[in-house]
């Protein structure tokens, strides 16, 4: 039986991506173990290795393999002896895979930063050069080294399914994000809908100004006057509400923007500028007119209500499990 190690990166989209991957893996003839950070660990998901233990407490941005914790992780992965490592551009697990000469696939939306050929005319660098460079050249070079030593580099993004997808460099492939098409339903019809994992205060404040608005969140029991908060773990209700809303709002996570695209909904992003992936997604999505970036809660939404996008599928693009099935 094929043994897989899936390693989630240290960001919020990695949590959504991991949860949906594991859902698809249910009942398949594979053994799957998971390495993840606290930030990327879905509720109720069994985590075999919590990667926060490998971080420097005082300088978490400094990633080093010269530690007892890393050596222990290496030994345990070696004992598990996976046939395939799937990494969401996760540094430590990628290093272990290379040391063990294990087949390594990168599957991450963060690969947008490396894979797209023409990325200098979308405003990403002119407007956000500080964010792009604040983690310094060593971090970027570290990621490039990982990509050069991976067997496949999959760009996890719905942009590959658009009618005119951005061109990718050699050695990169699009991978389709997991999603569901919601059903048309009168009870699911609401005005504005938002998806957020952390109860983003700006999004909460914005939606309070618009009647019949609903927020899907990991913290649905927090009391918010004038808002409906629902559990994002209920994916059936989440996608039903998304399919039938007038407008979708999020922070720019890949999975949320992909959900809106495949359900034909226009998006607004109140971008999380602490997360480079959210910034990249927001910029590229706005550039190809799938969404708009909103900066202030005082901005109005009336001109965006009811806008739609043309969802599409590129027959050449597959889901990650379809690649696994070919092994």
Regions found by a protein language model. Give the residues of each.
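Donor nucleotide-activated moiety binding/catalytic core segment of transferases
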Residues: 65-75, 219-262
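Leloir-type glycosyltransferase catalytic cores
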Residues: 129-152, 287-327
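Catalytic donor nucleotide-activated moiety binding site of glycosyltransferases and closely related
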Residues: 37-43, 47-49, 53-56, 197, ...
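A donor-sugar binding/catalytic signature common to diverse glycosyltransferases
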Residues: 85-89, 114, 238-281
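Glycosyltransferase specificity loop/lid
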Residues: 1-81
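Active-site donor-nucleotide binding/catalytic segment of nucleotide-sugar enzymes
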Residues: 5-18, 125-126, 131, 157-161, ...
